[in-house]
């Protein structure tokens, strides 16, 4: 069962406006979804980023680690009628319920009405985030570009009825190859990214390079399994995204 925390209020680093977000408390996994060669699995939440979203106030990308955490909201809005308030005043409000209600009522309306952070999940979301801040740190740029790669590949993923998960515009098609080449630059020399590197080379049609990279993957109990499967695709000169 997927469950979320009570709302957490943050201040946007760009406009100082407020937004709310929820963290995952527990997550439901579907056992019958495919695992794809680009590293994205079929879980509904797989491509969404929990590290960055779109501020509902100024509509710019906001990284959670840059946003100031203001407060945690209660899961349910504190409310109390007149008789309840009188009772708690007379009895000393021993459990603090009246204090909680009064503190809530004293909060600015704008804070209480803060809208949710808009999560990035579509290709255009990640393109916009990269365009807004072209001087991202390598780690942040990689985070966005990998998810853009996944989102652009969604046109090749299919649901249970054989329908493509997403369409792709001309602009998105034109950016797909440069995006993959840039990811290759960003992961150059990273031993942990060898499977990703091999898959990118395969999708770019550089099959011999892909095979060489995948054969050199260091076993860790999982990576080598993916590497062997992707290597077979590269050896067969198959460049398209494939379920593993």
PLM-predicted stretches and their roles:
Residues 1-85:
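N-terminal cysteine/histidine-rich coordination modules
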Residues 81-166, 189-203:
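Amphipathic alpha-helical repeat scaffolds of TPR domains
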Residues 127, 180, 214-215:
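Inward-facing hydrophobic residues that define packing positions of alpha-helical scaffold repeats
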Residues 183, 216-220, 224:
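Alpha-helical solenoid scaffolds that mediate protein-protein interactions
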Residues 195-203, 229-239:
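"A position-specific structural signal for the A-helix of alpha-solenoid helical repeats
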